[in-house]
Amino acid sequence: MDYDPAHAMSRGGSMRQTISRSVSKASRNMEDIFNTSSRRTKSVNEDEEALKWASIEKLPTYNRLRTSLMPELGEDDVYGNQILNKAVDVTKLDGEERQKFIDMVFKVAEQDNERILTKLRNRIDRVGIQLPTVEVRYDHLTVKADCYTGDRSLPSLLNAVRNMGEAALGMIGIRLAKKAQLTILKDVSGIVKPSRMTLLLGPPSSGKTTLLLALAGKLDKSLDVSGEVTYNGYRLNEFVPIKTSAYISQNDLHVGIMTVKETLDFSARCQGVGTRYDLLNELARREKDAGIFPEADVDLFMKASAAQGVKSSLITDYTLKILGLDICKDTIVGDDMMRGISGGQKKRVTTGEMIVGPTKTLFMDEISTGLDSSTTFQIVKCLQQIVHLTEATVLISLLQPAPETFDLFDDIILLSEGQIVYQGPRDHILEFFESFGFKCPERKGTADFLQEVTSKKDQEQYWVDPNRPYRYIPVSEFASSFKKFHVGSKLSNELSVPYDKSKSHKAALMFDKYSIKKTELLKSCWDKEWMLMKRNSFFYVFKTVQIIIIAAITSTLYLRTEMHTRNEIDANIYVGSLLFAMIVNMFNGLAEMAMTIQRLPVFYKQRDLLFHPPWTYTLPTFLLGIPISIFESTAWMVVTYYSIGYAPDAERFFKQFLIIFLIQQMAAGIFRFIASTCRTMTIANTGGVLVLLVVFLTGGFLLPRSEIPVWWRWAYWISPLSYAFNAITVNELFAPRWMNKMSGNSTTRLGTSVLNIWDVFDDKNWYWIGVGGLLGFTVIFNGFFTLALTYLDPLGKAQAILPKEEDEEAKGKAGSNKETEMESVSAKKGMVLPFTPLAMSFDDVKYFVDMPAEMREQGVQETRLQLLKGVTSAFRPGVLTALMGVSGAGKTTLMDVLAGRKTGGYIEGDVRVSGFPKKQETFARISGYCEQTDIHSPQVTVRESLIFSAFLRLAKEVSKEDKLMFVDQVMELVELVDLRDAIVGLPGVTGLSTEQRKRLTIAVELVANPSIIFMDEPTSGLDARAAAIVMRAVRNTVDTGRTVVCTIHQPSIDIFEAFDELLLMKRGGHVIYSGPLGRNSHKVVEYFESFPGVPKIPEKYNPATWMLEASSLAAELKLGVDFAELYKASALCQRNKALVQELSVPPQGATDLYFATQFSQNTWGQFKSCLWKQWWTYWRSPDYNLVRFIFTLATSLMIGSVFWQIGGKRSNVQDLTMVIGAIYAAVVFVGINNCSTVQPMVAVERTVFYREKAAGMYSAIPYAISQVTCELPYVLIQTTYYSLIIYSMVGFEWKASKFLWFIFINYFSFLYWTYYGMMTVSLTPNQQVASIFASAFYGIFNLFSGFFIPRPKIPKWWVWYYWICPVAWTIYGLITSQYGDVETPIALLGGAPGLTVKQYIKDQYGFESDYMGPVAGVLVGFTVFFAFIFAFCIKTLNFQSR
């Protein structure tokens, strides 16, 4: 092996090593406690040690491979340095023992990792074992994708309809639209070699992710792929590439309520130990033959890492340590709803999840996003040691590798525009570009140079050849020249000789789909699901409480003292209560749908990584739902059975309990199946309600079996509710109290007569047939759930969008003038729209929050925690200030406090703007704030986002033409012109890339023409070239005379030195430097070097990295100083105080900022702009509007065809009950669908609203009214075609007044349902809670709708709720408008001739035709009320916590 473990660290790492060595010196007094600790100890313990090893050698192989020596500190360790080793079973080590071992072996991760791996390698080499290696080759690999271009790529309603039509025609072979073909990778070839660290570099959209996916065998099936990828000569279809290699995604998908350690443990259990156990077995055999005893630490490490079937493995603790996650291992990962670990830590969990497995071929996609450079260096250093010492094959793409990290790599692959510009040793890459005439500047990182030198905009600045004029060298020229370059020709020669398959180690590739036995995988999944169930206990308690509350309401509504058993009418009330019990317990499963969908992204990731087969996930889910269901069913039965007064018979109680339990199980199964088929919340809400509609309509209770049209009768036999309804009614009505009485016509038993009225089979055996049916459906639906998870893929992949192609010739000409054009733009900026340059000064700023509960529990006495400690400084016009510090220093906190963005906490201190005290109302008008998270409306284009911001934030006096011109100039400034028509999209799902979103965030603030701009980490998550583009935009902004402050994480040299001044903070909210950077950062460097003991900055070292290391906590401990105190005592601090004093006095003749209004536009102007944006958002949300329209169409056709021409039947009560059933079903199902589909829409837009409101764009009321207004035309279209279809198919009387009433009542009913959904979102912190809150009232709305129990039968203590139930008024209006004037006689139950229809609906339901005016008024009132509450809550409730 050509790697030397003592390989000298790069110049970049030397500084860090100096500090880490000095910090760990104290802990290394008993250096290497496992090795012979001292001569004295050696002589004492040698024999004992040998005896212990000898006793282990005698054990049977199975036991020997589980037993090792565990170091144990003796009583006199501190004084006598005595180490005792005890024999332990590695599979039975508890968490504390494992942690103790890891802490002893890996004191300083990057140094000790190398030490232990070197020992491990030496042990393997000593007995001559060859490690399996994998060489990955790709030959002439080309990847193409079909995509729409220009306007056709926008997801509008029209395009969605066209796409659906084309897809349908495509199935029969007709192709209409020609899609453009986008080449992602263009004929690339190369080799990724084992035991060499390979770095993948390239600007955004160069195809890095596609290359990594192609090599890992995970490319999307829809892509057009040619060429081949081989592992050790084997094609991808000859083994299982997903188990042989691991692709580490740039998207962090994890279960939010699992802790970091649990996440890694589950991954380790699913991936197994691979060949580690076989290697250990062979190693132990050879050592035994050679009479060699291993070293205790390596032996324990290897045996514990190879231990199979353990719940928590040592390899997890090791991975946590080398990734620096050991500090947060017991913290939950968190998600949008729950605070967990930081973004950088989440990124490391994604990495850890894969490297915890046995796979040694890793393709890692942007693993450093959100990490500071020292953490990235540490992780890459540990990976380098793994690669060099265990001969792993690793290809890593990094965004902004610091020079010291870049130097850890052996090989570089440089990709640009889908072509390979260079692949080979790192040492020759600069030589390659120098051969063209490009040179990397002195103070520039090589990685940054490489990403910019192929870019048209950046190339010229690196041209150094004085003998030739510069010309743009395109990527294709670089790629073809590389093939002739000595590195390229050597690579071609290697590729021309095929890999000899016979040399491939038998353990190198995986040929089995799963790593461990299916029973073990089932056990792992069971443990995980059980844990998640316990964590989700609040959710289950909430569901049970909800069931108990509805049960209590039901039992007081149908109270036994009010219930009788005299005749059919009494029996019908009982049947109504049973029917309601069925429906409530059916809908109780609805929450299962939201939970399943929430878990799907993580499930798909783990399924595609072959962690476990889908059935090992679905089986525990189903089985663990049973006890919860038993508990909920028991709660329902105990509360309702005897209080309602069902048959007083224990057997019938348990029989009804069984039916309720099976309904819950069947419902959970059907909702899981719907969730797994629909895969998104909007479609699932719609699809789910459609399936339920079929089940309800054909269940035999809204429409008796014999009345169901012939064409729908088949559905009766496959509707689970028909079996449930038969069983539950037969159980009750066969009780003696019903069968011992005669019916009204005295020919049949009362119970039988009622069963005949409902068309239920009057046979006792139908109870057990019903039970069998429900049981069968439960199994079938859970089976379908498993099949759907097995074969369906996630929806909503990022779509490729090509903006309208521009004239190539114009493009060519524009290229060379770009820089001068940029300069002219920046010069004009201040002139086109004038602004007042403003300075900001702040003196002794402090910020407190209430002491967190966890800290109080640990005994902290203070009531407040101080996050900022007396910060004093100033920001000035035309000066670009960097706000820096380690994580937790308070950078973002200070910026939020100064910008007035904090929603809680206590602020002290003096903040002034150009000498006047800061007033937040006026400050919001003259300042901009670019948040770290790029929050934008997903359905508008880039240009529309900017127009919206400009029209709302620029002064009224600015003309429309000037505003539009300004928008175009800002797009030019931040280089967004090519993307002006691109849809923004959702982060990580569709639309713009991270870097494009970042530039849009800056542009949205710039179009407001602010004087002061705050930017929170504008370059985090960007590659070097993108960061350079963003910083160029920032610099251009400052040069117009604005005041700009940026928090910045770990900048490269050129980004750092683009700043003029620096405000440096340390952990705890203290300032340790505030002042100018100086040329080449000399002022900062001189300031810190002036303190005794601070090491000098190494040559060409990044001053930002040096400064953070030199002032770190570790450095303070070593030097015994506090840099905050040193700063306070410095002359620099005094100068700053003087500057702040000077800026705290207004200039001569200056007046305080004053605006006559809080917002730049009046309320009408705000409303118009908000409506404009909402209109486009709605138009481009086909997953909301088109799905809603399709659902309504399907519902109306279904109801129309089931209740075909039933509206004209009025001869008896059963006919009228069927019509009321049809109207009830239609109102409830379309209403609930409107309510649930609008929720995600409002939730997404509310997040954007918080940002825009904080920016002072508009007031909450115009925003809320615009969203309410947008619904009006869509609901009108929905109502019109719905009413036409239902009215004609059900066969109501064609009379203009009746039809218009029908449309009017339905329109306002659908509107109030929609606004009710919007209101629930505005009342709750997130969409999930809104969904649960809304569904809590569905049951109550149903119960009091007048369908299950008519108003005259409702007890007087509940009748008030009938009057405030919107659904009751809808049914009142619809029935009365159609039948309130009908004088035809109607036959009552039992066949007796009786009243007119008009009289019957008045007596039975309390509906009177004279009250149609008030009904209309009340329906309009509900609509206005829900809309008003929505607007009021949006205005007053803020669920954002900062």
Swiss-Prot record:
Q: Which GO terms describe its cellular component?
A: plasma membrane
Query: InterPro entries under this entry?
Result: AAA+_ATPase, ABC2_TM, ABC_trans_N, ABC_transporter-like_ATP-bd, ABCG_dom, ABCG_PDR_1, ABCG_PDR_2, P-loop_NTPase
Q: Which residues form the ABC transporter domain?
A: 169-442, 840-1092
Membrane topology per the entry is: Multi-pass membrane protein
GO molecular function term, any single one? ABC-type transporter activity
Instruction: Give the main location.
Output: membrane
- Cite the PROSITE patterns for this sequence: ABC_TRANSPORTER_2
Show the stretches that span the lipid bilayer.
538-558, 573-593, 619-639, 657-677, 683-703, 714-734, 769-789, 1186-1206, 1218-1238, 1272-1292, 1299-1319, 1329-1349, 1357-1377, 1414-1434
Q: Which residues bind ATP 1?
A: G202, P203, P204, S205, S206, G207, K208, T209
Q: In which tissues is it expressed?
A: Ubiquitous with higher levels in roots.
UniProt binding sites for ATP 2: G885, V886, S887, G888, A889, G890, K891, T892
User: Is the keyword Membrane assigned to this protein?
Assistant: yes
Every ABC transmembrane type-2 domain range = 520-733, 1165-1379
Q: Keywords in alphabetical order, please.
A: ATP-binding, Membrane, Nucleotide-binding, Repeat, Transmembrane, Transmembrane helix, Transport
Q: Name one Pfam family in it.
A: ABC_trans_N
Q: Does the keyword ATP-binding apply?
A: yes
This protein's source sits in the domain of life called: Eukaryota
Query: What switches on its expression?
Result: Induced by cycloheximide (CHX) and cold/dark treatment.
| Compartment(s) where it occurs, according to its Swiss-Prot or TrEMBL record | Membrane
Q: Which PANTHER family match?
A: ABC TRANSPORTER G FAMILY MEMBER 39-LIKE, PLEIOTROPIC DRUG RESISTANCE PROTEIN 1-LIKE ISOFORM X1
Q: What does this protein do?
A: May be a general defense protein.
Return the similarity comment.
Belongs to the ABC transporter superfamily. ABCG family. PDR (TC 3.A.1.205) subfamily.
Please give the name of this protein: ABC transporter G family member 35
What species is this protein from? Arabidopsis thaliana
**What is the organism lineage in this UniProt record?**
Eukaryota, Viridiplantae, Streptophyta, Embryophyta, Tracheophyta
